[in-house]
Regions:
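Auxiliary Fe-S-binding modules of radical SAM enzymes
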Residues: 2-22, 30-33, 222, 230-312
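N-terminal [4Fe-4S]-dependent radical SAM core
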Residues: 2-74, 79-94
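Hydrophobic faces of well-ordered beta-strands that scaffold small-molecule active sites
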Residues: 33-37, 93-95, 126-128, 152-156, ...
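Core AdoMet radical
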Residues: 61-81, 85-107, 122-135, 151-177, ...
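Acidic (Asp/Glu)-rich catalytic clusters
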Residues: 85-87, 114-121, 141-151, 183-187, ...
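Short, electropositive alpha-helical surface patch
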Residues: 111-117, 144, 204-221, 277-299
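Conserved C-terminal portion of the radical SAM core fold
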Residues: 176-235, 251-274
């Protein structure tokens, strides 16, 4: 696989990267917490519209394992979510609609939910996770209206730029679909964060870095980099047990992250460098269950890269 030879970003020069927590703190003058909510949606590749079973890596909660229940009114969800972080001193929040596809459903119902969340003074912004094939003109117009009330970020799943991977994991969209929707959202001045997953067992390291290149070229404002978790109750988890798929070590993952950061423009916001699935459901890699140790190792590794390059 051939990559561009020029260095397209400042990360490659000194490995400084733009942490989203720092962006929010500078913007709002204090630490801002992201609280996970649900709009009570499903997905078109779960209900038969495009497919069944969902993406093979996705949990029964639609990758919203830490989100509040979608059966609760949004005000109640927010109050419950706030209690989880108020003990840390949290007073300002991003309302993150995380579970399933949060623009898939009746637009009037969704707009009512999002508007109610945006109307709360402690909610500074909305973050809405969705799929590129669930952003029709009516949804774009809704997001445009919401963006005039509070800043809106659309968190858009890419997962991989590899077409074979997208077929295997049952996403039911293409990388070009993703790129077209990023362009449309940016035309409406809506912030976009791309999600990619690293560690699919059939992908090479070059494939994974190419996904980061693809996001860099798509025009997205930010990125979430997520290591593949094999979870109980998912097709991916079943396949892991059946085929004994190899998993990355923490050391291997950290070096891969270094390569991915090197593929990104210096102004791109980094929203996540890894994730933590529900421990009770985690099959592998088990080291990801210790989030503090994982993040400390990754931070120290990236710092070592910065120190090494500064000494050259």
């Amino acid at each position: 696989m051939i990559f561009k030879t020029q260095n397209i970003n400042g990360y490659g020069e000194n490995m400084e990267y733009l942490k989203i927590g720092d962006v929010w703190k500078e913007k709002y003058g204090e630490k801002v917490y992201k609280i996970s909510l649900s709009a009570g949606c499903t997905c078109p590749n779960r209900d038969g519209t495009k497919g069944v079973g969902g993406c093979i890596f996705c949990s029964e909660k639609g990758s919203g394992d830490f989100a509040q229940s979608g059966f609760l009114p949004i005000a109640q969800q927010i109050e419950q979510a706030k209690k989880l972080v108020e003990k840390k001193g949290g007073k300002k929040f991003i309302a993150y609609f995380q579970s399933y596809t949060n623009t898939y459903g009746d637009v009037k119902r969704l707009e009512k939910i999002f508007t109610e969340a945006a109307s709360m003074p402690e909610i500074l912004e909305l973050a809405i996770a969705t799929r590129c094939d669930c952003l029709g003109e009516d949804v774009i117009q809704m997001l445009d209206r919401l963006n005039k009330i509070k800043p809106v970020t659309v968190e858009l799943g890419l997962q991989s730029s590899n077409p074979e991977t997208l077929k295997k994991i049952n996403c039911c969209y293409t990388a070009e679909d993703f790129k077209k929707r990023v362009k449309l959202l940016k035309e409406h001045n809506i912030h976009v964060v791309a999600h990619i997953i690293l560690g699919f067992p059939w992908e090479s390291r070059d494939d994974m870095v190419q996904s980061a290149h693809f996001v860099a070229e798509s025009g997205a404002d930010g990125i979430k980099l997520q290591l593949l978790h094999y979870l109980k109750g998912t097709k991916m988890g079943e396949d892991y047990l059946k085929y004994n798929y190899p998993t990355m070590t923490l050391e291997e993952y950290a070096t891969l992250l270094g390569d991915c950061l090197n593929a990104l423009p210096a102004g791109m916001e980094i929203h996540r460098l890894t994730g933590d699935g529900a421990k009770k459901d985690l099959l592998a890699p088990l080291w990801t269950g210790d989030k503090r140790k994982t993040m400390n190792y990754i931070s120290n590794y990236i710092k070592s890269l910065k120190d090494e390059r500064r000494s050259l």
